[in-house]
Design a protein with these regions (language model features):
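N-terminal hydrophobic or amphipathic helices and topogenic motifs
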Residues: 1-31, 35-37
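Short, well-ordered beta-strand elements
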Residues: 6-18, 39-45, 111-115, 141-143
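A structural signal for short loop-to-beta-strand junctions that line the ligand-binding cleft
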Residues: 10-14, 79-88, 108, 112-115, ...
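Short coil/turn segments
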Residues: 15-19, 89, 98-102, 117-122, ...
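Pocket-flanking alpha-helical
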Residues: 21-29, 44-82, 92-104, 122-129, ...
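Short helix-loop capping/hinge motifs at secondary-structure junctions, enriched
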Residues: 35, 99-108, 135-137
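Short beta-strand-to-loop elements that line the ligand-binding cleft
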Residues: 40-48, 65, 137-148, 182-185
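Pocket-lining segment of extracytoplasmic ligand-binding domains
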Residues: 69-70, 148-196
Length: 196
């Protein structure tokens, strides 16, 4: 009888709960591509979306899905990480307000509260966007809302959120009957980048 080599086990920490951005990983799992490569891949949703790169650097996982701008911050902070691939080739991040809010332009954020989920790069993206409208981060109050981007807007805990994905939160908000208005970083002073 033929002997089968043991499969290599790979733990992948996701950047967020499973969503359409992870489609290549889900498809590979469900169609047996990982099996064909002799891999047992475990996808793990994070308790905190800022932790996957730190956990991978601490050897608590083999791979972490993260954001390109966040990787640059982590490398600058000397985390032992290496980029191995791309899942999403263009920005998904956006600054979102409720469509019926008084905020019509980014300049209207002066004195307002902005929620975020991953510190370090979302505030940098927001800072660059604010600068194109004559504001700085000192002109807004930042609040970590973790995974509750849309709910924090609905509950009026924040006036805007940075880090909402245009292909997820905006659709979720429409489904919930609370449509959003998005400002895209690449249209407000941030160079285009690969999201995941």
């Amino acid at each position: 009888s033929a002997s089968h080599a043991a499969k290599d086990e790979v733990t992948v920490l996701l950047d967020w709960f499973i969503n359409p951005d992870h489609a290549p990983l889900i498809v590979a799992s469900q169609t047996g591509l990982f099996d064909k490569a002799n891999l047992t891949v475990t996808l793990v949703e994070p308790a905190d979306p800022s932790m996957p790169p730190k956990l991978a650097a601490a050897k608590q996982a083999d791979v972490a899905i993260s954001y390109q701008p966040s990787l640059m911050v982590d490398l600058n902070n000397e985390l032992p990480l290496m980029r191995i691939g791309t899942l999403v080739h263009s920005p998904l991040n956006s600054l979102v307000v409720l469509a019926d809010s008084e905020i019509k332009t980014i300049a209207d954020l002066k004195g307002k509260t902005v929620g975020f989920s991953v510190g370090g790069f979302e505030d940098a993206v927001l800072g660059a966007m604010l600068e194109t409208h004559g504001l700085t981060l000192a002109d807004v109050t930042l609040v970590n809302v973790n995974f509750a981007l849309s709910p924090s807007l609905y509950a009026k805990q924040v006036d805007a959120v940075i880090g909402a994905f245009r292909n997820f939160e905006l659709n979720q908000m429409d489904i919930d009957g609370r449509p959003g208005r998005a400002f895209y970083p690449e249209e407000h002073g941030v160079p285009a980048y690969e999201e995941l």
